[in-house]
């Protein structure tokens, strides 16, 4: 990696500062909409809170943001970039060679992050729309929660509906809108605190610790389940590292944190001033003058939409990375924007929409959604901590020190997990079930791939080079295609899947002028695009290793076109002049891609568990994208061949001949 790239990545700019506000901080920036409301409602309402309770709550929020978001994510996790990319799968690719079991925390963390992403739009948009209950002239309409639900669903329909067109055209306003949002949080919060400056005593962690063990705290340690809502967006901050660069996050986070903390302090000051008023509105909206509330609701709705958009885009990226790491089924991916970073996965988009909409309809109010919110993300953070521990050791930190630091964060996060676990019976089971379903799919896909590698036999290409040459020159067979391309899952030291040679020589001899054996390897770097060619001492057999980053599309024909041109220009591959063509000077022949799918037959070698894995994976494949579409072959000539997973299983089965009995012997 060049020094200039590192400098650009670590450099901050005014434009980068604004962009970071629109991309990185949507989730954590909308937390003030519902965090204080959750704390107050769980304590029994505004009338039931005391000054010490409020001071302790604000102190817990401040120190949670400091320990988890600032220290763990901003100061430690942002250092763990994989060629400028962040997130749990990028972190996993950095450390996966250290231990094979690290795939487990990576899958669990990715699954819980996805399930959390399905709930975030429901919580944020509903919370924003519920602010209309505090707007004079509209409150009588939105006191009816059904109207809140209808408005929320309309916004969600529009939000998920525009994903297919790309969001670049509206993405340009995200940064400025969020700058206005955070500025409003800071300014309004500051003015609300002017009458109660004692609220700033909450900076002292004594008040946080005192509240945890105070009899005034009706929920005990379980209050941390509500406190954690303030920092749920910390994981997204790390995941979006590649979009804005480390330098811009370093510069923008202090501004964001100050504005968020001032907002919480301002709400706390309003509660202290109005705890005997009998007002039971969301402190976030109630703390603003009534004539400004309609503008605040509009701004909050925009901020909620931006936060939701960031989670949706993040989910697409997360699934895309998981597919390329071969731990998730293949789904069709499109790129509606001008760059590879703007991707769209239709199936995931509509699954997210269905889950989000059902969440709104099932829980109805943001208060009920908050009861379920945050449980999954505590698990994601714990999994990230495990991977960070290995990363620190890999980077040369002494194991004892790495274990000490990460054990501290793991302990803090486990306490938050334990405090949030009470949410399971209050709706948290929804995200847990969703996360378990995603983990199950990931496990099946990963385990199925390992089983295939275990049982599919390999043969040495060199041993069959002469046979392939004879077939190439044998005019008794019609020319199958000028170029025949086989995609191989593994190709090392001239070893290749037996099923490929079976297809060329046994199933139906395929005569061609050139045989291509292509293997796509996903690299730990995100944007690699390299290849290696071995002609095997011939001009008719070509081994191609494609090295593509885990964020690169695997459109094989486009890369192969470039490789063919390079080989012909260098003289390693003879030109294939075409007698009949509408393209003058065309010197590349026709191509046919042969895809081989291994299916489970009555394979006696498979255990019952392995057979269950393979049959389940086959069932999942029915609703996923075909390899043809995944490798960009939909506009190419393709042959799909099905072979048994274990070829030897069909070659010879024991069977006994029944000898007919002569009538005379009867």
Curated annotation (Swiss-Prot):
The residue ranges crossing the membrane are 16-36, 58-78, 100-120, 141-161, 165-185, 221-241, 253-273, 294-314, 343-363, 373-393, 399-419, 424-444
Q: Which Pfam families match?
A: K_trans, K_trans_C
Q: Where in the cell is it found?
A: Cell membrane
Keyword Membrane part of the UniProt annotation:
yes
Q: Which GO terms describe its molecular function?
A: potassium ion transmembrane transporter activity; symporter activity
Q: How does it sit in the membrane?
A: Multi-pass membrane protein
Q: What does this protein do?
A: Transport of potassium into the cell. Likely operates as a K(+):H(+) symporter.
Record-stated family: Belongs to the HAK/KUP transporter (TC 2.A.72) family.
Protein's recorded name: Probable potassium transport system protein Kup
């Amino acid at each position: 990696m060049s020094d200039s790239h590192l400098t650009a990545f670590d450099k901050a700019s005014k434009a980068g500062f604004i962009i970071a506000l629109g991309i990185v901080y949507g989730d954590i920036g909308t937390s003030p909409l519902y965090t204080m409301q959750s704390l107050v409602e769980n304590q029994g309402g505004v009338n039931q809170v005391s000054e010490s309770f409020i001071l302790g709550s604000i102190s817990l929020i401040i120190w949670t943001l400091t320990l988890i978001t600032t220290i763990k994510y901003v100061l430690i996790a942002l250092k763990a970039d994989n060629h400028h990319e962040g997130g749990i799968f990028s972190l996993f690719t950095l450390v996966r060679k250290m231990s094979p079991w690290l795939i487990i925390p990576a899958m669990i963390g990715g699954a819980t992050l996805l399930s959390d992403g399905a709930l975030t739009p429901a919580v944020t948009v509903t919370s924003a729309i519920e602010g209309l209950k505090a707007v004079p002239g509209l409150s009588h309409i939105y006191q009816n929660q059904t109207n809140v639900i209808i408005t929320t669903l309309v916004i969600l329909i529009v939000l998920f509906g525009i994903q297919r067109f790309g969001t670049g055209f509206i993405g340009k306003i995200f940064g400025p809108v969020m700058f206005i949002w955070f500025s409003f949080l800071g300014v309004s919060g500051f003015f609300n605190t002017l009458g109660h400056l004692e609220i700033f005593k909450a900076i002292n962690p004594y008040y946080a610790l005192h509240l945890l063990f105070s009899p005034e705290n009706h929920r005990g340690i379980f209050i941390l389940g509500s406190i954690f809502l303030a920092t749920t967006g910390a994981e997204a901050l790390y995941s979006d590292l590649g979009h804005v660069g480390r330098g811009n996050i370093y510069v923008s986070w202090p501004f964001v944190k100050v504005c968020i903390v001032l907002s919480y302090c301002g709400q706390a000051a309003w509660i202290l001033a109005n705890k005997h008023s009998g007002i039971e509105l969301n402190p976030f909206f109630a703390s603003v003058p009534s004539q400004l509330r309609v503008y605040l609701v509009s701004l909050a709705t925009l901020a909620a939409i931006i936060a939701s958009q960031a989670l949706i885009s993040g989910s697409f990226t997360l699934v895309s990375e998981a597919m390329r790491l071969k731990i998730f089924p293949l789904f069709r991916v499109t790129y509606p924007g001008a760059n590879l970073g703007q991707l769209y996965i239709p199936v995931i988009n509509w699954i997210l929409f269905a889950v989000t909409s059902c969440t709104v309809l099932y829980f109805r109010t943001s208060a009920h959604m908050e009861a379920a919110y945050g449980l999954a993300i505590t698990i994601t953070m714990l999994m990230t901590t495990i991977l960070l521990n290995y990363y620190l050791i890999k980077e040369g930190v002494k194991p004892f020190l790495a274990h000490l630091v990460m054990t501290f964060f793991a302990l803090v996060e486990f306490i938050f997990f334990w405090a949030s676990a009470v949410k399971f019976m209050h709706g948290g089971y929804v995200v847990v079930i969703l996360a378990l379903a995603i983990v199950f799919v990931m496990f099946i896909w990963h385990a199925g791939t390992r089983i295939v590698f275990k049982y599919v036999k390999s043969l040495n290409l060199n041993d069959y080079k002469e046979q392939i040459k004879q077939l190439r020159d044998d005019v008794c067979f019609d020319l199958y295609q000028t170029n025949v391309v086989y995609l191989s899952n593994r190709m090392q030291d001239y070893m290749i899947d037996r099923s490929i040679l079976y297809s060329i020589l046994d199933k139906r001899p395929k005569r061609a002028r050139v045989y291509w054996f292509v293997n796509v390897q996903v690299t730990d770097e995100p944007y690699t695009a390299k290849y290696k060619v071995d002609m095997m001492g011939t001009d008719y057999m070509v081994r191609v290793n494609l090295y593509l980053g885990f964020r690169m599309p695997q459109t094989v024909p486009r890369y192969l076109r470039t490789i063919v041109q390079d080989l012909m220009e260098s003289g390693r591959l003879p030109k294939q002049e075409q007698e009949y063509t509408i393209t003058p000077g065309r010197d590349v022949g026709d191509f046919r891609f042969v895809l081989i799918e291994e299916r489970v037959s009555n394979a006696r070698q498979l255990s019952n568990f392995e057979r269950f894995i393979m049959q389940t994976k086959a069932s999942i494949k029915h609703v996923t994208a075909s390899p043809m579409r995944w490798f960009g072959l939909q506009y190419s000539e393709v042959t799909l061949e099905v072979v048994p997973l274990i070829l030897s299983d069909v070659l010879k089965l024991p069977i006994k001949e029944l000898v007919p009995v002569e009538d005379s012997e009867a």
